[in-house]
Amino acid sequence: MENKENSFDVIVVGAGHAGIEAALASAKMGMNTLILNINLDTLGWAPCNPAIGGPAKGVVAREIDALGGVQAKVTDETMINIRMLNTSKGIAVRALRAQIDKYDYSQRMKEILETTDNLILRHGIAKNILVENGKIIGLETELGMKYFAKVVILTTGTFLRGKIFVGRNTFEAGRMGELPANSLTYSLIKEGLEVSRFKTGTPARVRKDSIDFSKFDIQETADEPLAFSYWSQPRVLTKDYPCYLGRTNSKTHEVIRKYIAFSPLYGDVKLIQSIGPRYCPSIEDKVMKFNKDTHQFFLEPESKHSKEIYLNGLSTSLPFEAQIEILKTIPGLENAIIERPAYAVEYDFVNPIQLKHNLETKKIEGLFLAGQINGTSGYEEAAGQGLLAGINAALKIRGEEPFVLDRSEAYLGVLIDDLITKGVDEPYRLLTSRAEYRLLLRHDNAHLRLYKYGYKYGLLSKEQYEQLHRLENLINHQIERLDQIKVSPNQVNDILASKGSSKITQPVHMSELLKRSEISYTDLKHLDEEAVEEKEVIEQIDIHFKYNGYFQRMQDEIAKMKELEKEKIPSDIEYDKINNIAYEAKEKLKKIKPETFGQLLRIPGINPADAINLRIYLKQKDKIR
């Protein structure tokens, strides 16, 4: 029976990276929220690599921060090693990556959940979703408890019918040592959702004092102060927790081939039929698929409170005895003691083409999905989806318009649009190459792009909003000024010569000189009567003038695409009745049900002729809105 004790606005199932952000966003937006997790000691757990960030993913962590999420802030509080990646490359691919203390990170997340208003944390394994007349009304747990809600958000990670593989040994688990959620999948199927399976894997953890680190190349934390969150004070970390680079060799590969018949992936009996992540293959996949003499891997610390070292790049599902033998072939790991074996895990997911852009399922009103249940991989991708699902859950209950980020606004917009429009046939990972406007979606401008949304939805304070609003105004003011300030040859030619830049023969605007790759604002700052000192402002000035031509071309492309996004496609359209559209296109359109012509043109297999014929049909029927 529904009562005050078991009724909520929002229920979040799973307290991993997606679930935490979803629950916090919902609660901060005033929704009475319940979050359930199988194990209350592993909230926000890092079951694979103990790190946040990397190319594209590091930018996502910054975007989450700009929208009012907590992943970046907690990373800053618990990190033990941090570096800026791709500093020698273009600005579009630069990103932070930090090693977190996985125990401190999890504990800090639990503290935040337990001290947030409108939020209750509770143990529970979801068994069934409760649906009436196509609408979610709550769920039932394995203990027989029924909870009622206006919205349910599923963030189930690898726990849906999770199954672990170590060689030919298999057992049911969501993660090593943790119970799976075996019943929930059948409830989703019963309600009409299509469910498939993916697999992922994790490497062995070895004891720190059994490794000879002198045989590996050290990668220390950065010398300059760094932080993910705009609201954190950047700091220089101690050098106590470096990472190391290692390599496999021909002997390693011989051992892998010797045991390959016992692999659940390659053995005579293929125990694993599902697809794994393309960009994070197992070591046996690398050896069997790529003709290389060596493969690199990294040794990464997991915590200040543990001696476990994570072997990033040596993920495997080979038998335990094979794992021991593999390590003995690598100089520095000959005496390594494995504390936790590597394993693969297979799990259920829901193809995300069954979702709307707000992450609500098309078939069940009020049911939202976020994280690995949508076929993605990665903590950052999960956290971003969770945050957006939490915001949209609250907006749905309020009766307000959904919050949908455009592909030109954020990597999170690219992520969601890719999932909804293209679906997944392998675990999805965000890459810079997936973003056609990546030059606009940078690490350095994440907060300037998104802070207004964070404030609009009540996830950033007025003080935070005003701080970033002031910064944005200052940057724009300085850029306008530098377009007006003129400098003479006598003032700048010595500076230009010292930088290997051609001299000028007549006065020019300072902005003209700043377009040169070798000249920075710092070089000319003494000539500016209203010179600024803020590092962030100087960085944005330099980027603006050097890349503005590219920015303008992208903005023109975005304007054209937004015109297509304005053309809505009715949800009740009967594609089978339309002539002159290819059969393959009709099948995809019926399945995905694009909401706009812009989205339609991003569906693989849909050609411009199909779009033109659909537009003609809709105009004839007077259905273009």
UniProtKB/Swiss-Prot annotation:
PROSITE patterns: GIDA_1, GIDA_2. Disulfide bonds: none annotated. Its main location: cytoplasm. GO terms for biological process: tRNA methylation; tRNA wobble uridine modification. GO terms for cellular component: cytosol. NAD-binding protein involved in the addition of a carboxymethylaminomethyl (cmnm) group at the wobble position (U34) of certain tRNAs, forming tRNA-cmnm(5)s(2)U34. HAMAP family: MnmG_GidA. This is tRNA uridine 5-carboxymethylaminomethyl modification enzyme MnmG. It comes from Petrotoga mobilis (strain DSM 10674 / SJ95).
